[in-house]
Swiss-Prot record:
GO terms for cellular component: virion component. This is Structural protein ORF142. Residues 1-24, 156-197 are annotated as: Disordered. The keyword Cell membrane does not apply. The keyword Iron does not apply. It comes from Trichoplusia ni ascovirus 2c. It is found in: Virion. Keywords: Virion. Residues 161-188 have a biased composition (Acidic residues).
Length: 410
C-alpha cells in the first residue's frame, strides 16, 4: 500500500517521517503489499485470511495511494480504479465492504502496517486505548503491536495462528506447504477407506512410491506456482519501478518548473521591493518638502499678520497726519487771506504815497514858503506814514510767522 506513499502524500504524513525510518518501513510495507496482492486469488488463503477491522475515520484519513492499495486488495481484476480520485475510491469502499458499528470489515493482509503514525494514533484513540497507553509518545511499531493485540483479543478470527502466519518467513511458508501437502495425501488415502495394513510389502512399496511421486509432483507444481508468482511479482515490481521512475521524472520536472516560477516570482518580488524603496524614498522627500512648505506658510502667515498690523498702524498714522495737514492747510489759507489783505493795505498806502508825492511835486512848482512849509509838513507826515507802515507790516509779518511757526511745530 505504501508504494505510492512518497508521491501521493495528500494528507498528514509528517509524524511518520519524524518518528520512523521511512525508507525501511516503506520497503517492508511495499513487500507485504506485494505478498498480499499475489495471494489475493488464492481461494484457500482467502478462506484462512481473518476478517480485519478498520475505523471509518482512519479510512477517511487515508491518502489516495493507501485507498488505492486497499481497493486493489479487494478488486485485483479492475483497471478503472487507477483513474479514480480519493472521493471515488472512498465511495467504492463504502459501497462494497461490510461494517460492524463504526469499524469497517476488510479482508486484507497487514493493513495496519500500511497506516502512518497519525492514522494509527487516531485509530488507538477511537478504540480508547489512550486511556491505558500513552499513544502520543509511541512510535509506529509499538502502535502496530498495540492494535494487533487489541483485535486479536477482542475480535477472534477464524484461525488461532493468523498473526504467526502473517509474520512467517518464506522458508516457513514452504515448510507449511509441504506439511499441508503431506496431510492432504494422507487424508485422501484415509477418505478412500484404504486399509494399508491389508497390503503386502509390494503394495506398500508401490503406495510409498506413488506417495513419493505425488509429493514430488506436488512440490514441482508448488515450485512452478511459486515461480509464476515470482515472475508476476517481478513484472509487477518492474511496472511499479517504471511507474515510480515516471512519477519521479514528473516530480523533478514539476520541481524544476516550480523552482523556475519561484525564481521569476522572487525576481519580481525584488523588483517590487526596489520600486517600493524608491517610492518610499520619493514619498519621504515629498513629505519633507510638504513639511517645509507648511513651515514656510506658517512663517509667511505670521509675517503677513505682522505686516498687516504694521500697515494698519501706519495707515492710522497717515490718516492722523492727513487730518493735521488739512487743519494746517486751513490755517495757511487763513494766513494767506490776511497776507492778501495786508498787501491790499500796502497797495493803498503806496497809492497814498504816490498821491502825496504828486502833491509835493505840484507844491514845489509853486515855490513859495507856504508851499515849502506845507511840503515839509507833508514830508514829515509821509515819513511818519512810512514809519507807521513799516512798523505795522513788521508787526503783521512777525505775528503771521510766529503763528505759522507755532502751528507747524505744535
Amino acid at each position: 500500500m505504501n508504494q505510492n506513499h512518497t508521491l501521493d502524500n495528500e494528507r498528514n504524513d509528517d509524524d511518520e517521517h519524524s518518528n520512523n525510518h521511512v525508507d525501511t518501513n516503506d520497503m517492508k510495507n511495499f513487500i507485504s503489499c506485494i505478498k498480499s496482492k499475489s495471494n489475493i486469488n488464492d481461494d484457500k488463503e482467502d478462506q484462512q485470511r481473518p476478517v480485519r477491522y478498520l475505523s471509518r475515520t482512519v479510512i477517511n484519513s487515508m491518502t489516495r495511494g493507501q485507498l488505492l492499495e486497499l481497493v486493489k486488495s479487494m478488486y485485483s481484476d479492475r483497471s478503472d480504479i487507477y483513474h479514480m480520485n480519493s472521493i471515488q475510491l472512498l465511495t467504492l469502499i463504502n459501497k462494497t465492504i461490510g461494517h460492524n458499528g463504526n469499524y469497517v470489515q476488510v479482508v486484507t493482509k497487514d493493513y495496519i502496517n500500511d497506516l502512518n503514525v497519525t492514522q494509527l494514533r487516531i485509530f488507538c484513540k477511537e478504540l480508547q486505548l489512550d486511556t491505558t497507553h500513552d499513544v502520543d509518545r509511541m512510535n509506529k511499531p509499538m502502535l502496530e503491536i498495540l492494535l494487533k493485540s487489541y483485535f486479536k483479543n477482542n475480535y477472534p478470527t477464524s484461525t488461532n495462528d493468523d498473526n504467526d502466519n502473517e509474520n512467517r518467513s518464506d522458508d516457513d511458508d514452504d515448510d507449511d506447504d509441504y506439511r499441508n501437502d503431506r496431510e492432504e495425501v494422507e487424508d485422501s488415502d484415509i477418505n478412500k477407506n484404504v486399509n494399508i495394513s491389508s497390503y503386502n510389502n509390494e503394495d506398500i512399496e508401490e503406495v510409498d512410491e506413488r506417495t513419493k511421486s505425488l509429493k514430488i509432483d506436488r512440490r514441482l507444481l508448488k515450485m512452478h506456482q511459486d515461480n509464476a508468482k515470482l515472475v508476476d511479482k517481478i513484472d509487477m515490481l518492474k511496472n511499479t519501478i517504471e511507474d515510480l521512475q515516471n512519477r519521479l521524472l514528473t516530480a523533478e520536472t514539476t520541481r524544476d518548473d516550480i523552482l523556475r516560477r519561484y525564481s521569476i516570482l522572487e525576481n519580481r518580488e525584488n523588483i517590487r521591493d526596489d520600486d517600493d524603496n524608491r517610492n518610499s524614498t520619493t514619498i519621504s522627500n515629498l513629505q519633507n518638502l510638504l513639511n517645509n512648505a507648511n513651515i514656510a506658510m506658517t512663517r509667511s502667515r505670521i509675517n503677513v499678520a505682522d505686516l498687516t498690523a504694521s500697515l494698519n498702524e501706519r495707515t492710522k498714522q497717515l490718516e492722523d497726519c492727513l487730518t493735521r495737514g488739512r487743519e494746517k492747510d486751513a490755517s495757511i489759507d487763513k494766513l494767506n487771506l490776511k497776507v492778501t489783505e495786508l498787501e491790499k493795505l500796502l497797495q493803498i498806502q503806496r497809492d497814498t504815497h504816490q498821491d502825496a508825492t504828486l502833491k509835493i511835486s505840484n507844491i514845489r512848482m509853486n515855490d513859495n514858503n507856504a508851499t515849502r512849509i506845507q511840503i515839509s509838513s507833508l514830508n514829515d507826515e509821509l515819513h511818519r506814514c512810512q514809519d507807521q507802515i513799516k512798523s505795522t507790516s513788521i508787526t503783521v509779518y512777525n505775528r503771521i510767522y510766529s503763528d505759522l511757526y507755532e502751528r507747524l511745530w505744535s
